[in-house]
Structure formats: C-alpha cells, structure tokens
Curated annotation (Swiss-Prot):
Signal peptide: none annotated. It is a peripheral membrane protein. This is Methionine import ATP-binding protein MetN. It catalyses: L-methionine(out) + ATP + H2O = L-methionine(in) + ADP + phosphate + H(+); D-methionine(out) + ATP + H2O = D-methionine(in) + ADP + phosphate + H(+). The keyword Nucleotide-binding applies. Residues 7-250 form the ABC transporter domain. Part of the ABC transporter complex MetNIQ involved in methionine import. Responsible for energy coupling to the transport system. It comes from Streptococcus agalactiae serotype III (strain NEM316). GO terms for cellular component: plasma membrane. The complex is composed of two ATP-binding proteins (MetN), two transmembrane proteins (MetI) and a solute-binding protein (MetQ).
Length: 356
C-alpha cells in the first residue's frame, strides 16, 4: 500500500453563524489519508465528522485551513480552483449516504447512467460502462428493476455503482449502512472492501459504530465536539485506546462490557478466594493464548480458569482479549503475572481474591 497521502486536511476549521451565535463544528483538525486506505472517522451525532468530510470536495467550505487532494491544493484559506476546475476535481470523489437518493422513476441501470450524463461517452460506451458497474456491485440481474422493486441493500449497491461511474479515486461513505440490517451491512462492507482491493479505491467511512471500522478499516480517527481526539491504525487504537470515548466505542464493538456484566454475577467471581486474581488479558499478534497459559502453569503452577475469550482479526492481525481467574501461591502468582506482562500481553487486575 502506498504511503503517499491522497487526502491532506490541515488545520481545518468550520464555523457556522446562526443568528447571534457561532457554532464551531470542526476545530483545528488535521488528517492525512493515504492512497488505498480504508479510513474510518468515528463519533457520535454532532461530533463534526460529516461536516469534516464534506470539506474534502468543498461541498462544505471551511472557515480556515488547507486542503490538498491528490497533490493538488484546492483550498488554502480560500478556494484555489476555478468553478470548472472544482467540477473536475469533484469527479474524482464519489459519495454514498444513508439515504440512497435514487430516482424512483428510473431503473437501476438508468440511475447509474444518469451519473454519466456529462461524461462525453457515446450511447454504446455508456451502456457498456453501466453494465460493467452493475456487474461490479453484483446487480447485473437487477438492471431493469425500479428502486421500489429493490431491497435496501440492493438500492445501496445501485448508489455505489452510480458513485463509481466517473472512475473516482476516492469514495466517501457517510453512514451508508445505518439504515440496513446487520446481515446486509456486512454484505455492503464486504463489497466496499472488495472495491478497495480491485480498484485501489481510497475509502473514507463516516460512522458512529466502531464495529464497522473494526470490520474493514485499516486506520481510524475519533472525533468529539468538533475535535480530533485520537487517530492511528485500527490495530493500535483497539490495542491501546487512550481516550475514554475511544475506550467506550471499543467496549461496545467487542462486547466486553456485556460479557463483564455476566462474569461479575458468577459465584466463582463473587466469592473469589484468597490466592486468586481476576484479570483481563489483551494481546495483538499472538496466534493463540494457550501456550502462554500452559507456560505459566508449568513454570509457576498457576492455573487459569478462562471465563471469556474473544479474537478479532484487525487489518490481518489477530487481536485477542480474555478474562481469566489465575490461582496459585501468592509469590508464584506475582511471578506469573510479571511473566505475562513481559510477553507483551497487557494485564489488567480486575479483582483480587479475598477482597470486595
């Protein structure tokens, strides 16, 4: 994957003026997105994430900052392109939304063809391109269907085909799966991931769900109240989240919070005996946790009772999380915990035996 940024947003501010007050929707945000990235921007409603991505193609003009797209500066405290140049630049960037915005009176192929209206292609070339795009998104057999005859997932596939009609280098997905059921969401995310690989497409995902980022992104930014509060590779953010909001997003995405509620109700945890510790283990890159637990038993005679375990594959790397009860002699238990930490596994003490 190329390390050359295709999108550079530097010190972006967006301020709205409403009556006698100012709303600072985006505050001094800098984000660089590399060619070929699937880059997630996560935040709750009102975080400023949708406003931020709309500055990428100047659908929203910032109040200050610099925007560079594919090595071309398009904004430097003012728009640097003519209206014609800006139209050409916007052809390089496709967008899909939560609402599909299809024209109900047009068939699937006609909706896609509409995006080629000013392409200069012949009628035959347009038809061939539309057919290719519908095949790309898995809808060749639905070309003659109207939107009312399509499911939500199929409508979004038409919207994706339309967004790709002018061969953009960048695709912005603004909450594009929010209106879809979980199964269809996974299918659309798999399609986006496939397009990223086949076309070398750079994808910017706007979402309030860390689960979506976890499934397909390689980098993520977290926004809160217009500010960028955390940014990095998905692996780093999931392994070592710094900010409390990021930690909350990750707990929801991994299901650990729900698991902990059940674990805390177990009798063995409520009445944890002296000589036992309830610990949470997190690791990245280890193919399995079993050798480590076997090792501490062999070396320190410390047993491990696994109460919860989960492994995710993030950007091709396994990331694991476990909740276990470690039991043994006090000194051996201390040594075992140190050995676990020394093996690059993050250990968090949740409860100590004999204590409330």
């Amino acid at each position: 994957m190329s390390k050359e940024p295709i999108i550079k947003l530097d010190n972006i501010d967006v301020t709205f003026h409403q009556k006698k007050r100012e709303i600072n929707a985006v505050k001094d945000v800098t984000i660089h997105i590399n060619q070929g990235d699937i880059y997630g921007i996560v935040g709750y409603s009102g975080a400023g994430k949708s406003t931020l991505v709309r500055v990428i193609n100047l659908l929203q003009e910032p109040s200050a900052g610099k925007i560079t797209i594919d090595n071309q500066v398009i904004y430097d405290n003012k728009v640097t392109l003519t209206s014609t140049q800006l139209r050409e630049q916007r052809r390089e960037i496709g967008m899909i939304f939560q609402h599909f915005n299809l024209m109900s009176q047009l068939t699937a192929e006609q909706n896609v063809a509409f995006a080629l209206k000013h392409s200069g292609l012949s009628k035959e070339a347009k038809a061939a391109k539309v057919a290719k795009l519908l095949e790309l998104v898995g809808l060749s057999d639905r070309a003659q269907n109207y939107p009312s005859q399509l499911s939500g997932g199929q409508k979004q596939r038409v919207a994706i085909a339309r967004a790709l009609a002018n061969d953009p280098k960048i695709l912005i997905s603004d909450e594009s799966t929010s209106a879809l059921d979980p199964k269809t969401t996974k299918q659309i995310l798999a399609l986006l991931q496939d397009l990223n690989k086949k076309l070398g497409l750079t994808i910017v995902l706007i979402t309030h769900e860390m689960q979506i980022v976890k499934d397909i992104a390689n980098r993520v930014a977290v926004m809160q109240n217009g500010k960028l509060i955390e940014e990095g590779s998905v692996l780093d953010i999931f392994s070592h989240p710094r900010e409390s909001l990021t930690q909350d997003f990750i707990k929801i995405a991994t299901g650990i919070d729900e698991a902990m509620l059940k674990i805390e109700q177990q009798e063995v945890v409520k009445n944890l005996p002296v000589g036992s510790k309830l610990v949470q283990l997190k690791y990245a890159g280890h193919s399995t946790d079993e050798p480590l637990l076997n090792q501490i038993y062999k070396e320190f005679e410390v047993t491990a009772n696994i109460l919860y375990g989960n492994i995710e594959i993030l950007d091709g790397i396994p990331v694991g999380e476990m909740v276990v009860i470690l039991s043994g002699d006090e000194e051996k238990l201390r040594q075992a915990c140190q050995a676990i930490t020394d093996s690059q596994v993050q250990l968090t003490l949740l409860k100590e035996g004999g204590k409330a």
